Amino acid sequence: MQEAQVRVAIAGANGRMGRQLIQAALAMDGVALGAALVREGSTLLGADAGELAGTGATGVTLKSNLEAVKDDFDVLIDFTRPEGTLAYLAFCRAHNKGMVIGTTGFDDAGKAAIHETATAIPVVFAANFSVGVNVMLKLLEKAAQVMGDYTDIEIIEAHHRHKVDAPSGTALAMGEAIAGALNKDLKSCAVYAREGYTGERVPGTIGFATVRAGDIVGEHTAMFADIGERIEITHKASSRMTFANGAVRAALWLKAQKKGFFDMRDVLNLNDL
């Protein structure tokens, strides 16, 4: 393995994503696992992060205090909950650390706090870190530019039963990509629920439908439907490792940035396509 270019800390290390982020960090060239964090009072405190993730001992033990590991990492990767993420964000700003944020479910104030913090430190904030999803977002922009003015646009997403926010952050990012390509504000054209007598579909709206069931990792479809034909652009994830690998890749890229707000399209250099 190459010498480490970036040392990462993983928040929520005991969760499903946390364990896969540990695996991804240990496997990726140029990356070293510097710290792994769990909540205060966890029974896993002091356990080896690698053994927790099933990769073997690493010498990195689980801790709950960021202050204790502040000299052990350059970039914090966080896929937890909004309230925890914002606390981590304040710490990273105070100690000049980069941050990769995969947490979803932020309100407008939370998003504004992330943008404001990015004026001081480098932040990658994305609803989805999969390469395929971010290519899909670019395809949606192109499709919307050609067909968006005259088709009915619907976004359908499905996730596992444990997901707590809806629509998913990825579905909202899809809506924002489409609305942006049409010079619209998603808030003004989104329809999130239909029930009872709804009347005919309002032209120019973007509909959302949500499924929560079983162990679905993540499925997203955008439909551009006209009379006589429709286009459907779909992404299906079968493993969370695709998100973990993308997030660690983002951390490696972020180490070279001084400050600023970025998403995965910046990391993958998709904005000029």
Curated annotation (Swiss-Prot):
Subcellular location: Cytoplasm
Pathway: Amino-acid biosynthesis; L-lysine biosynthesis via DAP pathway; (S)-tetrahydrodipicolinate from L-aspartate: step 4/4
The UniProt record lists the keyword Cytoplasm: yes
GO terms of molecular function: 4-hydroxy-tetrahydrodipicolinate reductase; NAD binding; NADP binding; oxidoreductase activity, acting on CH or CH2 groups, NAD or NADP as acceptor
Single Gene Ontology BP annotation: diaminopimelate biosynthetic process
Record function comment: Catalyzes the conversion of 4-hydroxy-tetrahydrodipicolinate (HTPA) to tetrahydrodipicolinate.
PANTHER family: 4-HYDROXY-TETRAHYDRODIPICOLINATE REDUCTASE 1, CHLOROPLASTIC-RELATED, DIHYDRODIPICOLINATE REDUCTASE
Protein name in the entry: 4-hydroxy-tetrahydrodipicolinate reductase
Gene name tied to this protein: dapB
